[in-house]
């Protein structure tokens, strides 16, 4: 069976469970060979969607409630979870008797809410559309559906609660081609997309956000990484959680192959469960 023993959802000091919101609506144009037939988060690593790997990372730290932001080919993600036990269990079909027997059901302790956030909504717009499904939670996790890492989610949540600002972003050191953040201590003093230099930190996703961040998002056209993050940064309300461990996005076929090779080696760095 995949996974570790059941862990209850991470509970903040006020007794509320922390949910994880995952963006899963993009088209993944640089993975066209894979994403013509499925949404990018359903591209597989080791036979399992990268979305599943991301959820396992959170679940390893006790975060078991998820809100998934659907868009492009979102029905495929709905069908995957509707038939999750079939995808991950051995079954016997007795066609004559019209019966099905499930063997060794590979269940997860997850509650998954799947929300259509629009075919063409931007990242901020997708986040805004799921606000009402967070039940007014004081804080929640938020990340992209195409990147994995050995991020310590428990430490990340604790860090966010300690500094008291509105947003925490996981800052990572990547291979090139990403935007950068200037750090003043842990505070993000400037946020710039698509400008990277040697030794820079970038936005690695794995955010912890206060529900007050919805005041910074205007509509479906709002790009989360643009005005909202820049405004939070200029106000001193965006704090960086420095992650010096493994982090890898899956934006190209080459990166997918890299992740697949790690998984097949039995030494996938993001496998923290």
Regions found by a protein language model. Give the residues of each.
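Conserved beta-loop-beta/alpha segment of the NTase-like Rossmann-fold superfamily
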Residues: 6, 77-185
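Structural beta-sheet core signal
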Residues: 20-22, 68, 142, 167-170, ...
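Catalytic-core segments of class I nucleotidyltransferases/pyrophosphorylases
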Residues: 138-143, 148-161, 173-176, 187-273
């Amino acid at each position: 069976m995949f996974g570790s023993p059941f862990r209850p959802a991470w509970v903040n000091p006020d007794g509320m469970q922390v949910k994880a919101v995952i963006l899963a609506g993009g088209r993944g144009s640089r993975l066209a060979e894979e994403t013509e037939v499925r949404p990018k988060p359903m591209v597989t690593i080791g036979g399992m969607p990268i979305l599943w790997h991301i959820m396992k990372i959170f679940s390893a730290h006790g975060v078991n409630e998820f809100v998934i932001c659907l868009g492009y080919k979102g029905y495929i993600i709905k069908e995957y979870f509707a038939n999750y036990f079939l995808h991950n269990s051995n079954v016997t079909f007795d066609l004559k008797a019209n019966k099905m027997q499930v063997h060794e059901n590979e269940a997860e302790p997850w509650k998954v809410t799947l929300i259509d956030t629009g075919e063409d909504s931007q990242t901020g717009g997708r986040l805004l559309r799921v606000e009402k499904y967070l039940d007014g939670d004081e804080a929640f996790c938020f990340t992209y559906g195409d990147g994995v890492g050995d991020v310590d989610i428990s430490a990340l949540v604790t860090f966010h609660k300690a500094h008291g600002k509105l947003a925490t972003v996981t800052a990572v050191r990547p291979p090139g081609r990403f935007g950068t953040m200037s750090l003043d201590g842990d505070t993000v003093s400037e946020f710039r997309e698509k400008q990277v230099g040697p030794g820079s930190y970038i936005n690695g996703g794995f955010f912890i956000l206060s529900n007050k961040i919805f005041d910074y998002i205007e509509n479906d056209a709002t790009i989360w990484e643009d005005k909202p993050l820049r405004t939070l940064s200029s106000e001193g309300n965006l704090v960086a959680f420095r992650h010096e461990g493994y982090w890898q996005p899956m934006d190209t076929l080459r990166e997918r192959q890299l992740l697949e090779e790690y998984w097949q080696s039995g030494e996938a760095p993001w496998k923290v469960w």
